[in-house]
Amino acid sequence: MTIKVLVVDDSALIRNLLGQMIEADSELSLVGMAADAYMAKDMVNQHRPDVITLDIEMPKVDGLTFLDRLMKARPTAVVMISSLTEEGADATFNALALGAVDFIPKPKLDSPQDFNEYQDLILEKIKSAAHAKLKTQRAAPAVVVQPSHKPALSSRVINTQLVAIGASTGGTEAILSLLQQFPAVMPPIVITQHMPPGFTRTFAERLNKLTRLNVKQAEDGERLLPCYVYIAPGDQHLEVIKVGGSFKTRLTQGDKVSGHRPSVDVLFNSVAECAGANTTAAILTGMGKDGADGMALIDEQGGKTFAQGEQSCVVFGMPREAIKRGVIHHVVELPQLADKMLNYLASLKRD
């Protein structure tokens, strides 16, 4: 059964381009193209699409307002088409908080290779969105959430442990939820979230505002500090290396690994090699299998491994692959994951 797709964009060029890409795939059926939210509403009611690609910046009714109304009236898998501006990035994360499944930047097609790569990516995201679990809508929190009482971590744990997290589709909101449940005093945390360039800095700034931790986009060669969270920049691999007695970041522009740059496998492999048994790692919602190999190495080196449970995942791809490998010690739904990780870290002071 084909996946019914509706394209909503005020640009005729973008509509036709996306329509051309969708019609070239036998698994997808283009049921309509709308230039504004009013046309889109009629087409949603008429065609009942499985997936909608939605432009954020539209006349009359903007994409966020339409998305908000859609998710209340007829929840549907939505992939946002986002501009590479700071305002566009902010709007994108608001859209994900409102219930959009995923996003992709507007196409910049300067060569046939660009066209082919963009087509592969948008088709992959549409197909993944069609099978995604739509979460209950929740507005982006406006204030820092104060977590309930958490176990105190010893200074030894804070200064010797490393926490590593990997995610893809659905990960921006999952990471926010997880970090909001962590206390202000934690070991260094390194995160790879599949995301294109131009969005990771805004993502880090958003997390910094909405959690008790210090969150930043990682820079090359910086020392990892307790109470800080380091986000892999878009289109760069984030690795952790040990220099003297300190953990430091290394950013590289190497080939894609497991189909991605940044890659969760690259981060997890590096953490396993330099932190070994002092690693606590979690793999969250996402499509594909990136992170499974890295989790296997962390397990082999004696680290503690966690995976998000299927019920709370938007896409149960990456956690499933790691679980299938037999390298995950604890499978935990997102609401309980922070407590499980903290209880493990707190238990280390008694060892």
Swiss-Prot record:
Belongs to the CheB family. The active site is at S168, H194, D290. InterPro entries: CheB-like, CheB_C, CheY-like_superfamily, Sig_transdc_resp-reg_Me-estase, Sig_transdc_resp-reg_receiver. The keyword Cytoplasm applies. Residues 156-348 form the CheB-type methylesterase domain. Its EC number is 3.1.1.61, 3.5.1.44. The lineage of its organism: Bacteria, Pseudomonadati, Pseudomonadota, Gammaproteobacteria, Alteromonadales. Contains a C-terminal catalytic domain, and an N-terminal region which modulates catalytic activity. PROSITE patterns: CHEB (PS50122), RESPONSE_REGULATORY (PS50110). It catalyses: [protein]-L-glutamate 5-O-methyl ester + H2O = L-glutamyl-[protein] + methanol + H(+); L-glutaminyl-[protein] + H2O = L-glutamyl-[protein] + NH4(+). Involved in chemotaxis. Part of a chemotaxis signal transduction system that modulates chemotaxis in response to various stimuli. Catalyzes the demethylation of specific methylglutamate residues introduced into the chemoreceptors (methyl-accepting chemotaxis proteins or MCP) by CheR. Also mediates the irreversible deamidation of specific glutamine residues to glutamic acid. GO terms for biological process: chemotaxis. Its main location: cytoplasm. This is Protein-glutamate methylesterase/protein-glutamine glutaminase 2. Keywords: Chemotaxis, Cytoplasm, Hydrolase, Phosphoprotein. Phosphorylated by CheA. Phosphorylation of the N-terminal regulatory domain activates the methylesterase activity. It is found in: Cytoplasm. Residues 4-121 form the Response regulatory domain. One of its GO terms (cellular component) is cytoplasm. The modification 4-aspartylphosphate is found at D55. GO terms for molecular function: phosphorelay response regulator activity; protein-glutamate methylesterase activity; protein-glutamine glutaminase activity.
